[in-house]
């Protein structure tokens, strides 16, 4: 379970940052930054964990609790499909992270980033491999980013039905791959990804295993 040890070791304002959406075939990559004023409220500690380990219901409860708690600063940002195509997915994820941190009310003294690489935030940063299972700030960010992106993809699915985004969030499930073979791409598909091109050209079957690694706003106030 994550704890607040790293944050206390650094002292000052420490933000946790995580992103969601590097692997999908459609939609933006979304990043969140979460910073606690004076530690994590006790009622939140047991609700926070790596978003991938939580059920959807548990994620939604934790998301609501984070927004309801005092002394919790949350910022969300994204990099669009067009930015992913122009920059590549890693650089686009870094762009979303920088945007999220820049939207916090105060510049952090330290940024804890899930993973083994981090962008330049204009302040010190530390990479934490498996950080969403180690740091409560990163765990909180992983939950926020996941909920916001899932909601965005569900909204997009209403305008572009048939791809199952409300269920698969743009990932390359069999349902999504079959829809790409059948109906082709939408403006929200990552056409720069090889698998998307191969599916739309019929070069790979929809049931093939594996998954290759714009038109949404970079700031997602309306879905956060």
UniProtKB/Swiss-Prot annotation:
Per the record's keyword annotation, is Metal-binding included, yes or no? yes
Q: Which GO terms describe its cellular component?
A: cytoplasm; ribonuclease H2 complex
Any one Gene Ontology biological process term? mismatch repair
Matching Gene3D superfamilies, A to Z?
A: Ribonuclease H-like superfamily/Ribonuclease H
Domain RNase H type-2: where? 12-213
Q: Which cofactor does it need?
A: Mn(2+); Mg(2+)
Task: Kindly state what the record says about how the cofactor is bound.
Answer: Manganese or magnesium. Binds 1 divalent metal ion per monomer in the absence of substrate. May bind a second metal ion after substrate binding.
Q: What start-end ranges are recorded for coiled-coil regions in this protein?
A: none
Taken from the record, one Pfam family name reads: RNase_HII
Per UniProt, a divalent metal cation binds at: 18-19, 114
Listed A to Z, the keywords are:
Cytoplasm, Endonuclease, Hydrolase, Manganese, Metal-binding, Nuclease
CDD domains noted in UniProt: RNase_HII_bacteria_HII_like
Query: Where can this protein be found?
Result: Cytoplasm
Q: Which GO terms describe its molecular function?
A: manganese ion binding; RNA binding; RNA-DNA hybrid ribonuclease activity
Report whether Cytoplasm shows up as a keyword of the record: yes
Question: What family does this chain come from, according to its entry?
Answer: Belongs to the RNase HII family.
Q: What does this protein do?
A: Endonuclease that specifically degrades the RNA of RNA-DNA hybrids.
Q: Which NCBIfam families match?
A: PRK00015.1-3
Matching HAMAP family: RNase_HII_B (MF_00052_B)
Q: Give the protein's recorded name.
A: Ribonuclease HII
Q: Which organism is it from?
A: Gluconacetobacter diazotrophicus (strain ATCC 49037 / DSM 5601 / CCUG 37298 / CIP 103539 / LMG 7603 / PAl5)
Gene name, per UniProt, is rnhB
